[in-house]
Amino acid sequence: MPLINLPAFAGDLLADFERLKTLRVDTPVIQPAEPFLDMAGEDLRRRIFMTQSETGDSLCLRPEFTIPVCLRHIETATGTPQRYAYLGEVFRQRREGSSEFYQAGIEDLGDTDTAGADARAIGDAMRVLSNRLANRRLKVTLGDQSVFEAVIAACGLPGGWQKRLIHAFGDPKQLQKLLGELADPKSPGVFGHEVERLAILGILDDEERLVAHLAETMEATGYSTNASRSPRDIARRLKEKMELATTRLDRAALAVMREFLAFDLPLSEAPAALHAFAKKSRLKIDDALSLFDARVAAIAKVGAESDLIRYRAAFGRPLDYYTGLVFEIEAEGAPAVLAGGGRFDRLLTLLGAREHIPAVGFSLWLDRIERAIAAAGGA
């Protein structure tokens, strides 16, 4: 489909992508909706334009390129490593601006040098933006979900709580809300008198007794287990909810998590600060910090200006498929994010790839870049 109303710099941008040794690909505008609904995150899900096929399949207008490019890679059985570039329209419901706009970017699939590929993604994004905005100083914000995951695991949180906190990564208000719940958990009574009675009797602490009690209750009330979940499913779900609601994190562990989330410093200073924090807090997060250190060193090797990059421990991006590095780039004086990206090592497996394929990439918002160029007096 021919692209119309492209920004004037689009041709130069594609030339940059070619020089970066990428393969340009396109994907259909109409996409299966399920992958986006399952993996893209709540912020994007509520902006998707949904439709339906004649056979009742849920479809949507392409809201981003990462998932479609990964699906294309799987369908064509292309080998890795492979670097894809794209430029095309995406469609999202937005409060301001057009609901259809251009994005471009690079998806780097299959490179097993995680630190090197991460650094290349950041360096490439900075380079193509600098080529459009030569007179504007860039600002890069970098986070790392894998370090965050290592910290909360080392604090000894139950698996259910770890999942909730990971899901909230990048949402400061939600993270603070969850930390507040960990500081002041609920009592069993908030689930109702019957659950409180079971807790007092000790039945909640014994899964077999709880399953038997639920089975007897369901049989006595004529509730069909065939029409819903089994007593064991209900028991496990209830215990999970109770664990989430009643888990208390001690003050020392809460202080450790809050100290970690407060980190906001130049990237060059971050490795030493994180190692000192881990040592002081007695956290065993060596593997996550080793990768972090390697990435910082690799960023310096690709020539990215490290003084433009800040590390924020609480920084994440509103897409559920990220697993490690996350970053966004702005231009000083332009409040909008011009580029964003990160690592998504689990995505291709979730989409159906037969083998594990590590991946990292970034997207550019061309309408925002165009406005930034105009504001700077460019052409």
From Swiss-Prot:
Function of the molecule: Required for the first step of histidine biosynthesis. May allow the feedback regulation of ATP phosphoribosyltransferase activity by histidine.
Q: Which UniProt keywords are present, listed alphabetically?
A: Amino-acid biosynthesis, Cytoplasm, Histidine biosynthesis
> What cellular-component terms does GO give this entry?
cytoplasm
The protein's name: ATP phosphoribosyltransferase regulatory subunit
Organism of derivation: Sinorhizobium fredii (strain NBRC 101917 / NGR234)
Per the UniProt record, the lineage of the source organism begins with: Bacteria, Pseudomonadati, Pseudomonadota, Alphaproteobacteria, Hyphomicrobiales
Q: Please state which protein family the record places this protein in.
A: Belongs to the class-II aminoacyl-tRNA synthetase family. HisZ subfamily.
The record, for Gene3D superfamilies, names:
Bira Bifunctional Protein, Domain 2
State one molecular function term (GO): histidine-tRNA ligase activity
